Regions:
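N-terminal auxiliary segments of SAM/dcSAM-dependent transferases
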Residues: 11, 17-120
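Surface-exposed loop/turn positions
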Residues: 107-109, 159, 209, 255
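Conserved beta-strand segments of alpha/beta enzyme cores
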Residues: 40, 81-83, 110, 182, ...
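Conserved SAM/SAH cofactor-binding pocket of Class I
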Residues: 133, 137-220, 227
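SAM-dependent Rossmann-like transferase core, predominantly class I methyltransferases
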Residues: 90-156
Length: 300
């Protein structure tokens, strides 16, 4: 899974990485995002630890990076080894392109990088992303699960749609293209908002998708759009649990919530948090170690 700023350079880059337990994942992701153009995190199935790595200009923002990591170490009670490796921009971009071919997802979608010049797969809805900053979006199990879940509930024709923690904007764009509806998309990170807006524009969806920075459900702009018929939240298990009450409050009586960013072993925990607020399981989808949940109100 990745979040992105902008990495479009012809100069040398470096990759900075740490390996941390799950409870510290969000903290170290935020620390690297403060100075890195793109950040990804990857689960080691054998150890249960997470590799968090970011790409930035080589030697740039050193004081800020060291300060962010020191504060994060103190907050997490950890001192993970910080590893660095030089990464040439041209080589990094070439590897990213080669690792990001067209990716068919489910029955309807295909995810394409901007570097691809051939025609999209026939009979599928293309969603175009900048491969340089969106690597991790299309092939990640949580994203694929959300897109499959969207196909599953499309027959309900939801009208009011929210993508919470939009990242690259991929889920809002897929919903707008499949359902021909408007959508709201939010993210707490300013760079994610910029990236999502760029992707929305390159997909010709600016009239349909409105992207703004928001901290979860606290923003009036988010709340005024409620109740929502469809809510995406492809984030992580802990914030999903924290926001369960708000999701229940602002989800329409017959609405559906598509939640992901959680591992299969976290399903019971996340479900328990949402059941306390009257939401029940409608469907579960699996992609590798990742799970996607479709939830509804108990009366829906």
């Amino acid at each position: 899974m990745s979040r992105a700023g902008e990495v479009r350079h012809a100069t040398a880059l470096e990759t900075v990485s740490v390996t941390v337990p799950e409870h510290a994942l969000e903290l170290y992701e935020a620390a690297l995002l403060s100075v890195c153009g793109t950040v990804g995190f990857f689960l080691d199935d054998d150890t249960g630890l997470w590799l968090v790595e970011g790409v930035k200009d080589q030697g740039a923002h050193e004081p800020e990076l060291l300060a962010a990591l020191a504060l994060t170490d103190a907050a997490a009670g950890l001192q993970p080894l910080v590893q660095r490796r030089p990464t040439h921009a041209d080589g990094w971009l070439a590897r990213t392109h080669s690792a990001f071919p067209e990716q068919p997802v489910g029955r309807r979608f295909t995810i394409r990088g901007t570097h691809l010049t051939d025609a999209a797969l026939p009979g599928r809805i293309p969603v175009v992303l900048d491969a340089a900053i969106a690597f991790g979006s299309g092939e990640h199990g949580s994203t694929r699960g959300c897109l499959r879940a969207l196909e599953r509930i499309a027959y309900r024709q939801p009208k009011r749609i929210l993508d919470m923690g939009t990242g690259t904007g991929i889920l809002a764009m897929a919903a707008a293209k499949l359902l021909h509806r408007t959508a709201k998309a939010t993210d707490i990170e300013p760079w994610s908002v910029r990236v999502a807006r760029e992707n929305v524009g390159r997909n010709g969806l600016t009239p349909l998708i409105h992207v703004r920075r928001a901290d979860g459900w606290s923003a009036p702009w988010v709340v005024t759009g409620a109740p929502y018929d469809l809510v995406f939240a492809n984030i992580l298990a802990r914030p999903l649990c924290r926001m369960a009450g708000s999701l229940s409050r602002y989800l329409a009586p017959n609405g559906r919530a598509i939640l992901s960013g959680l591992l299969q072993r976290q399903v019971r925990w996340v479900l328990s948090a949402h059941r306390q607020h009257g939401l029940v399981l409608d469907a579960t989808l699996h992609e590798g170690a990742w799970a996607t949940l479709v939830l509804r109100h108990g009366c829906g």
